[in-house]
C-alpha cells in the first residue's frame, strides 16, 4: 500500500479575532461591490424608463437609499446580509399587434363608461351584411377560422364570433358535395326559389 500524501493546509492565523475580522471585511467588501453593481444597473434602468416615458408623463420611481451595513463582532461566524433593493418593475411596452384596431389600442385598460351595460348578453345579431366578406376570406385562407377572425378584425374592424365563421365555412365550403354553396343548404339539397 502506497503512503498517502498529506494535504498541505495553510497555517492558521495566530490571532483568531484578526482572522474573523478580516473574513468579515472581505464579505462586506464583496457585498458592497454587489450593491454598487445593483445600483448602477438600477440607474441604467431608470434612465431607460425616463427615455421611454417622454411621450406620457409617469410618476418617477424613487429608489430607497442603501441600508447601513452591519459588521460581524467577536468570533461569531454569522454575517448579516444587507436588505436587497426591490427589483425594478418591467417596462411595459405599448401593444403593437398588427390586428389591434380602434382608438383604445395600446392605451389604458380602463373600460369605457358604457362597458358595464355591454357586458349583458345582447341577443341575436345578423351577420348577413358581412356575408360576402366572411365567405371570401374563408375561401382565400382555406377555412382557417383563427386567421379569418384576425384578418376580418384588422380589415373590417369587426370581431366576428367563431361560431359565425364556422357556420359560413360549413355552409359555403367548396369541399362540400353539394356544390359551391350558392342556393344550397347544409344537407346539400338545393332549395326551390319562390318566384312571384
Swiss-Prot record:
Residues 55-64, 71-82 have a biased composition (Low complexity). Pfam families: Adeno_L433K_22K. Induction: Expressed at the late phase of the viral replicative cycle. Probably already expressed from the early to late transition. One of its GO terms (cellular component) is host cell nucleus. Residues 1-125 are annotated as: Disordered. It is found in: Host nucleus. Its main location: host cell. InterPro entries: Adeno_L4-33K/L4-22K. Disulfide bonds: none annotated. GO terms for biological process: viral DNA genome packaging. Keywords: Activator, Host nucleus, Host-virus interaction, Late protein, Repressor, Transcription, Transcription regulation, Viral genome packaging, Viral release from host cell. It comes from the Viruses. Part of a genome packaging complex composed of packaging proteins 1, 2 and 3; this complex specifically binds to the packaging sequence on the left end of viral genomic DNA and performs packaging of the viral genome. Self-assembles into higher-order structures. Belongs to the adenoviridae splicing factor family. Component of the packaging machinery which encapsidates the viral DNA into preformed capsids and transcriptional activator of the viral major late promoter (MLP). Binds, along with packaging proteins 1 and 3, to the specific packaging sequence on the left end of viral genomic DNA and plays an active role in packaging of the viral genome into preformed capsids. Specifically binds to the 5'-TTTG-3' nucleotides of the repeats making up the packaging sequence. Forms a transcription factor called DEF-A through cooperative binding with packaging protein 1. All late proteins expressed from the major late promoter are produced by alternative splicing and alternative polyadenylation of the same gene giving rise to non-overlapping ORFs. Expression of packaging protein 2 and splicing factor is controlled by a L4 promoter distinct from the major late promoter. This is Packaging protein 2. It comes from Human adenovirus C serotype 5 (HAdV-5). The lineage of its organism: Viruses, Varidnaviria, Bamfordvirae, Preplasmiviricota, Tectiliviricetes.
